[in-house]
């Protein structure tokens, strides 16, 4: 559905302009006379929602399809976990379809307590929600049980509420060791992985010698299969060593894990399809994001799975026609952790300001995230691949205090020719110039706003311009980290 251009007063309209700047070297806007407040200062108590506003929120949530998905549209860290946590209250099942402990989802409970999850689905805070780890995920059992122990120590019951696919692959500690050795081997060309062993584990899956959760039911052959993996790693990497004693200790550890994991192990393909037949409501929680997709991302600076819409089907074993609404989560600016192209990256003071104000440090690694303006070209590319029905714009409050904000609306070659699609060529991506549209910023604290019409006019202009450029409506707007800090549009 087309969007009408937002109405502005003449002064605001005059403030919008276009500019060309080289990729990764965009000139930051002039600093504000008063520096934007910290995220902590922005966390004020939410105002009580009006009755019409509550009705709007209820309408948005109740209109979602039986099977819906929440996927990232950038390079991860968009804030998917918060939306999943909120939506989970209306769903019977929340499922992870791919990835592993490289995905860091930060959520807050009703008391404001922070939880950082990596493998357990974000729906776990909702006591009536069943959580599923699908066949497309890779499971590091020491980390999995550490998460469960942490949740239960905080009063969140996990017993009988988490199902793990018997087809999911097991990620071992040695995979993490190999991940680090691989990065060292790459030297200056390193990919910048989380070193959580994701790539090596998926590599074993693809060459068909990996161990799956179902192998824990056959501990008599488990040791021999694990020995094959360890031997291959030792042959491949000079710095990798293991002994018969190491193998024995690992097998003994997994014998205990097998006993503890037993109640969780399920044929989740059957469970998911039966749940669909029973009209259960299912919410799929994507890890990472489309720009990290093994096929569609900035290869080779990508993850080893498919965090796009296609990964839902292959990672859970459900049919494409069963999937309805897909919500794309996009930060109001762009961030990236690790190496790889980043056309709208800000290397100056504005990038530092966004990092500090947005608390942009990786949930999984703790590394500072690279920051830049919202990349509309990349966003449209992700929308094209996934077919999103709506968007969740997060962290709009972080832009408060900037005199002007920019949208990267086009890529151009060095000679000024506009590029029609998102390039696969990394050399081209590193050389492109970004065409920016400049919009006026806002000074008002928006962290307590819960009604779209109460946002500053220029903040609404920013949201509506994104809708107009992408052609997809923004239904949810994040203005803070808490559960309640969400505007339903």
Swiss-Prot record:
GO BP term, example: IMP metabolic process
Cofactor note: Binds 1 Mg(2+) ion per subunit.
InterPro entries with a match to the protein in the record: Adenylosuccin_syn_GTP-bd (IPR018220), Adenylosuccin_syn_Lys_AS (IPR033128), Adenylosuccinate_synth_dom1 (IPR042109), Adenylosuccinate_synth_dom2 (IPR042110), Adenylosuccinate_synth_dom3 (IPR042111), Adenylosuccinate_synthetase (IPR001114), P-loop_NTPase (IPR027417)
Keyword Transmembrane helix: no
Record has ATP-binding as a keyword: no
Function text: Plays an important role in the de novo pathway and in the salvage pathway of purine nucleotide biosynthesis. Catalyzes the first committed step in the biosynthesis of AMP from IMP.
Name assigned to this protein: Adenylosuccinate synthetase 2, chloroplastic
UniProt organism field: Oryza sativa subsp. japonica (Rice)
Organism lineage string: Eukaryota, Viridiplantae, Streptophyta, Embryophyta, Tracheophyta
Gene transcribed to yield this protein: PURA2
């Amino acid at each position: 559905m087309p969007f009408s251009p937002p109405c502005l007063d003449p002064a605001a309209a005059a403030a919008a302009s276009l500019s060309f700047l080289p990729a990764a070297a965009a000139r930051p806007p002039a600093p504000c006379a008063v520096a934007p407040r910290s995220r902590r200062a922005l966390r004020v108590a939410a105002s009580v929602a009006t009755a019409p506003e509550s009705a709007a929120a209820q309408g948005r949530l109740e209109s979602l399809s039986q099977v819906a998905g929440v996927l990232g549209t950038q390079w991860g860290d968009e804030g998917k976990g918060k939306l999943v946590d909120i939506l989970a209250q209306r769903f019977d099942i929340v499922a992870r379809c791919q990835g592993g402990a490289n995905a860091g989802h930060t959520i807050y409970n009703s008391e404001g307590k922070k939880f950082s999850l990596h493998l357990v689905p974000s729906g776990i805070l909702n006591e009536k929600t069943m959580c599923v780890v699908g066949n497309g995920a890779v499971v590091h059992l020491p980390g999995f049980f550490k998460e469960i122990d942490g949740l239960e120590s905080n009063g969140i019951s996990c017993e009988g509420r988490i199902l793990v696919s018997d087809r999911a692959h097991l990620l071992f500690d040695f995979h993490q060791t190999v991940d680090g050795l691989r990065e060292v081997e790459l030297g200056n060309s390193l990919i910048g992985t989380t070193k959580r062993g994701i790539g090596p584990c998926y590599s074993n899956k693809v060459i068909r010698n990996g161990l799956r959760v179902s192998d824990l039911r056959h501990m008599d052959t488990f040791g021999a299969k694990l020995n094959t993996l360890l031997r291959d790693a030792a042959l491949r990497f000079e710095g990798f060593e293991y002994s018969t004693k190491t193998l024995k200790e690992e097998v003994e550890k997994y014998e205990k894990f097998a006993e503890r994991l037993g109640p969780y192990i399920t044929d989740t393909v059957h469970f998911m399809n039966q749940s669909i037949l029973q009209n259960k409501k299912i919410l799929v929680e994507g890890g990472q994001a489309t720009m990290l997709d093994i096929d569609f991302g900035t290869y080779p600076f990508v993850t080893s799975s498919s965090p796009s819409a296609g990964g839902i089907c292959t990672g859970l074993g459900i049919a494409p026609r069963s999937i309805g609404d897909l919500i794309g989560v996009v930060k109001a600016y762009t961030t990236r952790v690790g190496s790889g192209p980043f056309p709208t990256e800000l290397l100056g003071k504005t990038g530092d300001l966004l990092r500090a104000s947005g608390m942009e440090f990786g949930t999984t690694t703790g590394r500072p995230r690279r920051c830049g303006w919202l990349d509309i070209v990349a966003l449209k590319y992700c929308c094209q691949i996934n077919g999103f029905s709506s968007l969740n714009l997060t962290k709009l409050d972080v832009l408060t205090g900037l005199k002007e904000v920019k949208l990267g609306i086009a890529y151009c070659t060095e000679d000024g020719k506009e590029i029609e699609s998102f390039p696969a060529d990394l050399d081209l991506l590193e050389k492109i110039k970004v065409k920016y549209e400049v919009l006026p910023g806002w000074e008002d604290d928006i962290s307590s706003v819960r009604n779209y019409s109460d946002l500053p006019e220029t903040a609404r202009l920013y949201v509506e311009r994104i809708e107009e450029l992408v052609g997809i409506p923004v239904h949810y707007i994040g203005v803070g980290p808490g559960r309640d800090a969400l505007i339903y549009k």
